[in-house]
């Protein structure tokens, strides 16, 4: 007699996902992209699926269904993807080279450093710091030269 009854987990689609009209789902997908990406709501730490649903006049279950079916990920992963993409740009931008990783995390909408690092690593298979260092090693001419600000003639005359 076996002690454990182990069965293989069956992959099944949530029933509510199949009830949504595909045409309506495509329309909602475009509206979600407009709000999250074009309006850059992904930068808002407090912009949840609930707030998105309110803005679209629907419920969170419907938002979840559309994001899962059309983007093949959950809402949090969907939003974090755009945050990470922007962070990648900032991390290698000479203008932001002096920013700490935590500051970049805050700029793109993560609530804390830990979730930023975890999301970044999950998507890129490296830490944000390693990503920045790798870029700088591959493009050494891209480093910002730290020089003292020169005094203008006006500043010199005021001394």
Can you annotate each of these PLM segments?
Residues 58, 110-111:
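The short coil/loop that forms the "turn" connecting the two helices of the helix-turn-helix
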Residues 2-94, 98, 102-103, 119-122, ...:
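Membrane-proximal linker segments that couple transmembrane helices to downstream signaling/catalytic modules
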Residues 61, 113-114:
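Key DNA-contact positions within bacterial/archaeal DNA-binding proteins
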